[in-house]
């Protein structure tokens, strides 16, 4: 068995494949714009590092639970798309670098501010408003929450949300919410843009790379916040349609929020959940943008919305992307190395999220045949529905195709497809009917 030991500085500019990867104390591996594929485990000794830069990714191929070990760290960047008042949903690609083998917990203090191609400063925290500058990055810990199905009564209300703050209690595969920061950081670290040209803060995730089987609990008629837990892209279709993951309904729900929001009060929030239907393993899937609802002081849904979200490619979740899943049964679903892929963000199939000013989208040549309906309701907001035309659609709810609406309570003036006594944002129809 081939085992690669790195004793000195090693720069990588081409795709490389290893059986095992060992980086010695004081050494590092630098990967620029390519993929490192390791068939089995990664062992990073103390003070060793793997730097993934310019969309470089680490993919591992071992089945079963992780055997990664060591106190060295992987460093990988991801950019948020929100200001100090707007949420992004995240899922960390790394955990605490400890001596015990396997995946470990995460907390936001494992996120850094890049200062050069390889160096970074540890972030600090405050209570409510995050800030950034060319000398510091301050994250507001008050807005760090996770949503666990066993603790809640449904999406959209305060029940089930657990306040994490800066504690290292986010288990592998648990997603979390985090608001962005105000200010700009013009520091350049070898990437295409500066650290934060405005509402696009770059974060440096540093820790042990997550790997292998990661278990996510689900329950009947409830949601769980999870996401992509790996330092590589995640094939969301493969995850949702895995034959072992039938405890969820096969749909991913993505939070979108109006980027112009400038208040921390629930009543001033404008946001909602878009739905992604994978359709099939080979399909690019169908994403129905969120309808932006407003919320009451307790976090429950108000009676009107404001506008709609953006068309975003969702087949491959980029590093750090969080999303909700919905349970059809009590049990667990599993994220696996077999669901991972090397797909660069912005390739036409993978986007973290887009600011409304970023309108360019690569149109795929493999679109699912569909009809979209943009329905304006009282000139207040638009509900988009999708009708997918596929040969194997049934009259019932088709798993991974028909998307249950994420709104627990329908608005008084709204429109849906009605399937099996439930509201759906997307439906399917046999193309010969």
Could you describe each region identified by the protein language model?
Residues 139, 143-173, 182-186:
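A conserved hydrophobic secondary-structure block that centers on an alpha-helix together
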Residues 85, 94-141:
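Conserved "landmark" site that anchors the functional core of diverse proteins
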Residues 56-108, 208-231:
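Extracellular, surface-exposed repeat architectures
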């Amino acid at each position: 068995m081939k085992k690669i030991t790195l004793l000195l500085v090693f720069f990588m500019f081409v795709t490389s494949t290893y059986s095992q990867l060992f980086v010695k104390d004081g050494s590092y591996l630098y990967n620029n714009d390519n993929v490192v594929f390791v068939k089995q485990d990664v062992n990073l000794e103390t003070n060793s590092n793997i730097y993934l830069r310019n969309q470089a990714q680490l993919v591992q191929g071992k089945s079963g639970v992780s055997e990664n070990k060591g106190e060295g760290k992987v460093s990988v960047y991801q950019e948020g798309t929100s200001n100090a008042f707007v949420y992004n949903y995240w899922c960390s690609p790394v955990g605490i670098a400890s001596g015990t083998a396997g995946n470990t917990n995460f907390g936001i203090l494992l996120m850094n501010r890049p200062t050069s191609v390889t160096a970074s400063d540890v972030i600090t925290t405050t209570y409510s408003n995050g800030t950034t500058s060319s000398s510091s990055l301050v994250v507001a810990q008050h807005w760090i929450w996770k949503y666990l199905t066993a603790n809640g009564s449904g999406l959209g209300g305060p029940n089930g949300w657990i306040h994490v703050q800066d504690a290292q209690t986010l288990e592998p595969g648990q997603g979390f919410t985090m608001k962005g920061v105000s200010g700009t950081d013009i520091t350049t670290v070898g990437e295409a843009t500066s650290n934060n040209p405005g509402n696009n803060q770059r974060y440096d995730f540093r820790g042990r790379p997550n790997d292998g089987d990661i278990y996510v609990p689900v329950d009947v008629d409830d949601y769980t916040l999870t996401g992509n837990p790996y330092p590589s892209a995640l094939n969301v279709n493969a995850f949702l349609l895995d034959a072992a993951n039938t405890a969820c309904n096969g749909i991913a729900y993505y939070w979108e929020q109006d980027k112009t929001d400038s208040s921390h009060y629930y009543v001033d929030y404008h946001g909602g959940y878009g739905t992604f239907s994978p359709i099939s393993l080979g399909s690019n899937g169908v994403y129905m943008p969120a309808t932006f609802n407003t919320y009451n002081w307790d976090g429950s849904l108000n009676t009107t919305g404001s506008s709609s979200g953006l068309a975003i490619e969702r087949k491959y979740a980029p590093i750090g992307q969080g999303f909700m899943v919905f349970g059809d049964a009590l049990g667990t679903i599993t994220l696996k190395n077999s669901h991972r892929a090397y797909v660069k963000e912005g390739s036409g199939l993978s986007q973290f999220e887009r600011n409304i000013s970023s309108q360019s989208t690569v149109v795929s040549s493999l679109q699912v045949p569909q009809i979209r309906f943009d329905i304006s309701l009282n000139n207040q907001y638009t509900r988009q529905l999708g009708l997918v035309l596929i040969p194997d659609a049934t009259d019932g709810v088709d798993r991974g195709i028909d998307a249950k609406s994420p709104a627990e309570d329908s608005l008084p003036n709204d429109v849906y497809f009605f399937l099996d006594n439930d509201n759906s944002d997307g439906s399917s129809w046999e193309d010969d009917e």
